[in-house]
UniProtKB/Swiss-Prot annotation:
Compartment list: Cytoplasm
Entry annotation: catalytic residues: H59, H108 (proton acceptor)
Assigned keywords, A-Z: ATP-binding, Cytoplasm, Ligase, Magnesium, Metal-binding, Nucleotide-binding, Purine biosynthesis
This protein's encoding gene: purL
Protein name: Phosphoribosylformylglycinamidine synthase subunit PurL
Any one GO cellular component localisation term in the record: cytoplasm
InterPro entries to which the protein is assigned, alphabetical: PRibForGlyAmidine_synth_PurL (IPR010074), PurL_linker (IPR041609), PurM-like_C_dom (IPR010918), PurM-like_C_sf (IPR036676), PurM-like_N (IPR016188), PurM-like_N_sf (IPR036921)
Subunit organization: Monomer. Part of the FGAM synthase complex composed of 1 PurL, 1 PurQ and 2 PurS subunits.
Amino acid sequence: MSEEPRFDTVAKAAATPDLPQPYTELGMKDEEYARVREILGRRPTSAELAIYSVMWSEHCSYKSSKVHLRQFGEKAPDTDVLLVGIGENAGVVDVGDGYAVTFKIESHNHPSYVEPHQGAATGVGGIVRDILSMGARPVAVMDSLRFGPADAPDTQRVLPGVVSGISSYGNCLGLPNIGGEVGFDAGYASNPLVNALCVGVLKHENIKLAQASGPGNHVVLFGAATGPDGIGGASVLASASFDEESQAKRPSVQVGDPFLEKLLIECCMELYAKDLVVGIQDLGAAGVSCATTELAAGGTGGMRIELDRVPLRDPRLTPEEILMSESQERMMAIVEPDKLDEFLAVCAKWDILASVIGEVTDVTPEEEARGGRLVMTWRGETIVDLPPRTAADQGPVYHRPIERPADQDALLADDPAALPRPSSDEELRDQVLRVLAAPGICDSSWITDQYDRYVMGNTVLAMPHDSGMIRIAEDTDRGVALATDGNGRYTRLDPYVGTQLAYAEAYRNVAATGARPLAVTNCLNFGSPEDPGVMWQFAEATRGLADACQALGTPVTGGNVSFYNQTGSTAINPTPVIGVLGVIDDVHKRVTSAFSAEGESVVFLLGETRLELGGSAWADVIHGHLGGRPPQIDLDAEAALGRVLIDGAAAELLVSAHDLSDGGLAVALAESCLRGGVGCEVDLGDDAFTALFSESAARAVVSVRPEHETALVDLCAKHGVPVRRLGTVGGSALTMVHRTGRISIEVAELRDAYESTLPALFGNK
C-alpha cells in the first residue's frame, strides 16, 4: 500500500470536505470561499486556494472597481486607431506607417513604501514586461510620484529610495525616462504613490496576446528561477490598507534584476522575429497562478502543468509558494512542438533559463462553451483541477455602497477667494517666488538627472518639457508624445471635474508639443473600497474620465486601479493619474516650452482666464488651504485649444508652447524663461493677482515670431480660442506690468528659487 502524500491533493480534498482552511488569512471572505467550493463541487486544495486567493484579490480581479470601469468600454469613442483594448496586458494603437504603439501605466505604491528601492525598481520591471508581452520592444518609461511633506523624515527615507530604484532599473535596461511628475502632500505620508508607465513600438502584424491555444502546444516558463520573494504580494501588499505593522511586510516585496530583464527583452525580441511564440504572458502579480489561469482562460483549450518542472532558487518551496511567488523577470510562452528546439536554443543563446512545464490540452464538446480545465500535478499527484476562467475572469463583482462624504459641501463652500491676497507689488513678487519654489512645482532635476533621458538616441523631448517625445523607429520621422497628470487637490474637491481636469492637462501637454492626442491609460489611486465615501469618489472619477474621453475621441486602452491607499482610516486624496499618448508626423516640427533667446518673439496667452483658485497652488503654498470649487472644465474649449496648438506646430508658427496648470501664468512664464535662459516683459492687465495665480483650464502660453502674429490670431479665431497679446521675449528678467505697478524678477533669481528646493531638502545626488 503506497504512502499517502503529505501535501494536499484533489483526491484528499474530495475525501476531507470539512477540513478547516486558512482562507481568511489569505484575504478571502466567507462568501468568496463558499463560492469556490460551489465552483469545484468540493473544498479546494491548498494549491487551488492559493490560486483563487490571489486571482480574486482586489489587485488582480478588480472586484470593487469592475462595475465602474465598464463605462470605459461602453462610452468608448468611435475610432479606428485602437488595435487592442482593455483586457490584455496593455492597449495597442495604430500610429501610422504600419507601426503600432503599446503603452500602459501601473502602480507599485505599497511595496515602494515598505522597501522603496526594490518596490520602485520592480514596478518599472513589471510594466516593461507588460509591454514586452504584447510583442513590442519597450522604448521609454515615465513615472508619476507622490510623497508626504518634502521635509518629513519618512519622505527623506522613501523618496531617495524610490528614485534610485527607478533610475537604476531603467538605466540598466537602457530605456530613456522621458517624463512624469512629482507631488508632495501630507495625505501621502506613509502612503506614497509610485506609478510607472512604459511605451513600446511594434509592427501591426507582430501583436502578441495572452492566449493558450493549440492542443499539444508546450507551456514554457523562461527567465529567472522562482524564489520566495513577493509571495502573496498581490493579496498582502496591494489589496489591504497600511498600518503600523507595514514594515513587517518587507518579505512580500519583490527583488529585481535589471540585467536579467535586459537579456529577457532581447531574447523575446528574437523569439518574436522568428515567429516562435503562439501566446505569451509576463509573470507579475500572482506569478504562476496568474500566468497559467489567464493564458488558459484566453485560449480555446485547457492546460496541464507539472509544477515540479518550475526552476527554483529555493528547493524547499511548497507548491502553494511556487504558485504565489512574484519573483521578477519571468515570462510564460505557448510554443508549437516543432518550434520548441529553436525556442530553447534562442533562450540558451541569451543565457535565459527555460523549462517546459506543461502543455495545452483539448476540451470536450461539453466544456467548449465554458472553456477547458487547468490541471496541475506535484510529484505525480493532481493538486489543481479547476476551470481557469473562474479564477481569471469570473471572480466576485461587488457593487460597493456609495455615499457622498459628509464634509463635501463644507469643503466646496470654503472658497479661497476670501483668503488674504498680496497687498503690494513687493508681496506679490514674493508670492510668485514662493509658489515657484514649492516642492511640487519647483525644478525636479534632482530626480530626473538620475534618469538617463536620451539613451537609445530616439528621445526628441524629455523632462522638463510639457510631454516626453520619442521617434518610433530609425526609418521614420514619426514620433509619439506622452504626458501623465493628476491633481489630488482638485479631485478631493470634485472627483468628476478633478479627473477631467487631470485628463485635460495631459491632453494639453501632448498638444503643446505638436502631437495629436490619440489614446489614454490611467492609474486610479484611491483609499479603501469598503469606505462608501471613497467609492463615491471613485464612481465620480471614472464617470468623469469616461465622459471626457468620449467627448474628445480618445479611447481608454487600459490601466490599473490601486485601492487601499490609506493609513488606518485616513485615505489619500483621490489621485487618478491620467496618461495621454499622441502622435506627431514629423518630430522635427516639435515645439518646446522654452522661450527662444534668438531673434524677436511675441508672447500670447490662449484661452480664457477667470478667478479660479479652488485647489490652486497659490492657496496651498501661501495659505495651506484646500477648499472651494476646482476650475471649471470645458471640453470643447480644450479641443479647440488643442487644434490651435497642433495646427500651429504643423505650420511652424510656434516658437514655444507651454500649458497653464499648477501655479497658473506665474509658473508658466517663469518656466519658459528659465528653459530658454531669457527674460520677457508682459502686461497683466487690471488684475495682476488673478492673471498670475488663477488656474483656469484650457489655456496655454505661446510665443511666435512677429511675422506670424497675424497667422496665430487668425488660427485662434478659426477655432474660437480667446487670444491675448501679453508682451515680448527678451532681456534678463521676467517683468510683469499691471495697471498700478511693475514687478521685475531677474532670471537668475527665478533660477535660484526654482532649482534650490529639492537639493536643499535631499542633498547632493
